[in-house]
Amino acid sequence: MAQTTPTPHVALIFGGNGWIGNKVFNILNANPDVTVYKAKSRADDADSVAKELDCYGNVTHVMSFIGRTHGTYEGEKITTIDYLEKPGKLVENMRDNLFAPLLLASVCKERNIHFTYLGTGCIFDYDDEHKYGDVTTGFTEQDLPNFFGSSYSTVKGYTDRLMHLLNNDTTLNVRIRMPITDEIIDRNFITKITNYKKICSIPNSMTVLNELLPVLMNIALDKKTGTINLTNPGVISHNEILEMYKDIVDPSFTWANFTIEEQNLILASKRSNNCLDTTILEYDSNYKVKNIKESVRDVLTLMKGNIYP
């Protein structure tokens, strides 16, 4: 039996060893008002989850940073959602991107524990009502998914809808997009696009983790519920990021563009492109969040320091 703790918040993180989950663990671990644990039970095993919650006894927050977006198939490392288009990957997709998060949400609802689910905003695509690159017509938290061009987005879209329907009173459903940090790793969106041979440049909402993860933790610890679009205000295109990268990080960097039609020919699945409305994040939550272009510039300055210390 784990010892009780006097801290006001006790958090149990599923996916705490993953890229984003570990970042969240470190943020919470540095907060003297929080005791944080990395879950050892499997998120798709209800009995194990219940036993682990019973073990700690005083958990106030459960957070899910699990999910399936990449993997290795027949010896090939696939760093994109095209992994989920491979034969036999439907089970992993449904288990990790639908069943496990909903199981955690259900268990938390039964115990009146606040649950934070890291979902995605890659469930929308520009259309006649949500115009290409137009920040005034962004998808709101209440909009229903309209993009089903990949197995990943299809499953995650229905997970998003179920979080609305079943668990809105205890669950914080968080939508992020194209996560960005200053790290030189293949999970970082900037690193990804600097390594691509060709780029399809489209204005999109994106999430700068350096800035928004601490904001998310404040929202979660305040036990806010419902859905929130956790992206920096505004949109930025791939070319704009790469132009900044060339200006700030590597003056010798070059790239080539191709069309979305040409991109679709080489990918196993289509990609979501959209602008998410950030009114709730900016105004209802009272957090001062930088515009995406300003925040990306800040991250690139840090990235330069990581490459050329």
Positions of PLM-derived features:
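NAD(P)-dependent short-chain dehydrogenase/reductase
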Residues: 130, 149, 161-214, 218
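Mid/C-terminal beta-alpha module of Rossmann-like enzyme folds, strongest
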Residues: 215-268, 272, 298-300, 307-309
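NAD(P)H-binding glycine-rich loop region in Rossmannoid oxidoreductase-like domains
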Residues: 44-98
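Amphipathic terminal alpha-helices
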Residues: 2-3, 290-309
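Catalytic helix-loop patch of NAD(P)-dependent Rossmann-fold dehydrogenases
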Residues: 86-95, 99-100, 122-174, 181
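Glycine-rich Rossmann NAD(P)(H)-binding loop
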Residues: 198-203, 228-236, 284
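SDR active-site strand-loop-helix element
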Residues: 14, 65-66, 115-121, 174-176
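N-terminal Rossmann NAD(P)H-binding glycine-rich loop of SDR-like oxidoreductase domains
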Residues: 4-29
